[in-house]
A protein has these predicted regions:
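An N-cap/entry alpha-helix motif that binds or orients negatively charged groups
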Residues: 1-26, 87-95, 99-100
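Glycine/Thr-rich beta-alpha phosphate-binding loop at enzyme active sites
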Residues: 5-22, 157-173, 209-267, 306-307
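Short beta-strand/loop segments at the ligand-binding rim of alpha/beta enzyme cores
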Residues: 30-38, 115-122, 184-198, 263-273
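Catalytic cores of alpha/beta
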Residues: 46-55, 198-213, 262-267, 277-294
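Glycine-rich phosphate-binding active-site loops on the catalytic face of alpha/beta enzymes
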Residues: 57-71, 217-227, 276-277, 282-310
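A gly/proline- and charged-residue-enriched helix-loop-helix capping module
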Residues: 64-116
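C-terminal helical cap(s) of enzyme catalytic domains, especially alpha/beta-barrels
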Residues: 70-86, 228-243, 299-316
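Active-site glycine- and acidic-residue-rich loops that bind
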Residues: 127-139, 167, 192-212
Length: 316
């Protein structure tokens, strides 16, 4: 992954800075976004590439997932391409340097680049060493460290790569986590990132909890554990093993979840739609379907460093 990041960083010197059309500015989460299209969590896990990613055209960059405790993630290999499906399988396991280190890095970045940064979201998750029953305090620690420097907080309870994490999506388990994060948020916007594999009624329940707690939004969706409908040979998929699937195969379910959320949230909370977005037409369709902002990641891997630039041009 570091090699991929480095390749994209070097590409920045060869292209001009791209800014989305002024007509596409978006007012959301108490901020003015230079466009609706941002980079999803998972690429810049340690907040090392925020400014270069803005230079590539992303209006917002969601760093992480960050955990309170530094951790190496799962053993390699842990990231696999399925080119025939324009998809990735990852079981990274929240590898990151820990909330305190990453918060210090963002603080320094804000001091040295006060006007040249995108909107910065901090995606926070449970430390692997922490038991599920202690998750609220673990999320609290991450929120306390990152809230002073992030523009919004994204509570990730939907990665399939941390044991027990997805059990935290139930309303009963999620409520104390969100209460803890809210107490440490310094008033920064809080969004919940959900899995596409949740049953429809559970998605609606989470949306209602967001409204009840007067939180700021939902990010829909994370990766899926489903392998349905892939054209990649079964033996190749099985060789990749367990992990979250992202990319084009996620498109339809992610869009369906957006259609579920819109009538529940009714514009009272922001929806960031992510999953299977590759083109400006797809991004525009998500906006038309009720998303306030859209994100991508796997398309960045398959379509290269000019990907955001092309989408921004077409969204003008």
């Amino acid at each position: 992954m570091f090699g991929l990041e480095l390749a994209y960083y070097s590409a920045i010197t060869k292209i001009r800075t791209v800014k989305p059309s002024q007509t596409r500015q978006v007012e959301a989460l108490g901020h003015t976004f230079n466009g609706p299209f941002g980079l999803a969590a998972g690429f810049d896990k340690n907040a090392r590439w925020i400014k270069p990613l803005r230079d590539l055209g992303f209006s917002h960059v969601e760093i992480g997932t960050v955990t309170a405790l530094p951790q190496p993630g799962n053993p390699r290999p842990r990231l696999f391409r399925l080119p025939a499906d324009r998809a990735l399988v990852n079981r990274m396991g929240f590898n990151n340097e820990g909330a305190e280190v990453i918060a210090t890095r963002i603080k320094h970045l804000r001091i040295t680049n006060p006007f040249g940064l995108p909107i910065i979201g901090a995606n926070i998750g449970k430390s692997r060493a922490v038991e599920v029953e202690d998750a609220a305090d673990d999320y609290r620690a991450s929120a306390k460290a990152l809230a002073p420097y992030a523009d919004y907080l994204a509570v990730n309870v939907s990665s399939p790569n941390t044991p027990g994490l997805r059990s935290l999506q139930s309303v009963e388990a999620l409520r104390p986590i969100l209460e803890a994060v809210k107490e440490e948020s310094l008033g920064k916007p809080i969004l919940v990132k959900i899995a596409p594999d949740l049953a429809d009624e559970d998605i609606i329940a989470v949306a209602n909890l967001v409204l009840e707690m007067k939180l700021d939004g939902v990010i829909a969706t994370n990766t899926t554990i489903s392998r349905d409908g892939l054209v990649t040979p079964t033996e190749v998929v099985e060789a990749a093993g367990n992990g979250g699937l992202s990319g084009a195969p996620l498109h339809d379910r992610s869009l369906a979840v957006l259609h579920l959320l819109r009538p529940v949230l009714q514009g009272k909370a922001t929806i960031i739609s992510v999953g299977g977005i590759e083109t400006a037409e797809q991004a525009g369709a998500r906006l038309d379907a009720g998303a306030t902002l859209v994100q991508g990641y796997t398309g960045f891997v398959y379509h290269g460093p000019l990907w955001a630039r092309r989408i921004n041009r077409a969204l003008k």
